[in-house]
Amino acid sequence: LDEGVVPVITGFQGMNELGDITTLGRGGSDTTGVALAVALKADECQIYTDVDGVFTTDPRVCDKARLLKEVSFEEMLELSSSGAKVLQLRAVEYASKFNLPLRVLSSFQEGEGTLVQEEKNIMERPIVSGISSIDSEAKLTIRGVPDVPGVAAKILSPISEAGIEVDVIVQNISADNNTDFTFTVDKSDAKKAEDILQKTSQTLGGGSIEVDDEIAKISIVGRGMRAHAGVASKMFQTLAKNEINISMITTSEIKISVVI
């Protein structure tokens, strides 16, 4: 670089703890770019994609989606983990760890894109910055297991040991001191999870196992929600007006997700 040479470095590959060459998984080139920018102490890392930047939602799904000029690391992490595919989650985590601003730009046309950085001007933030969705999950329910301390661990431990990642979890209490336990996993893991639950149900004296792979998870994200009440209520009312039933809900300080 000091000699004016522009190096072209391949992304998507790295080295594990044993020194073996390996790949970084989906979106690994983003992570490569961020790691190099951190090592070179760059002012920002620019990620060129097939979109103009980060939108309020997927513009291919909603023609009213708006380009965001700026979004915080925290919001981008929530959006990426909830289905937004514009930036790879690990790349955002790494940039946040070293406070390296990211700029998402289009490869096909000029523009300022979207700047992802530490939160600034919180008073000017919109309540909701973005909406993301995932339709690649399945919902599994184990019926009639005893409602006793530790039952959740007994259900989820074998799932975790099988390397299956669980997303949304809901536990319901019934009148006979039994509970229905529901959670979501990636569709590719649904059959394996179902087989594990069948064995768990027999061990716990539970009932039937139900699998539903025709679901979607919708999330709204925004740091402004911390200071504003009623966001969840408005979201639920909007879904109800459109006759969309909610089967699961999960929330954090800046994110509300529903499974429909």
Please annotate each region the language model reported.
Residues L1-I260:
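C-terminal catalytic "cap/lid" subdomain
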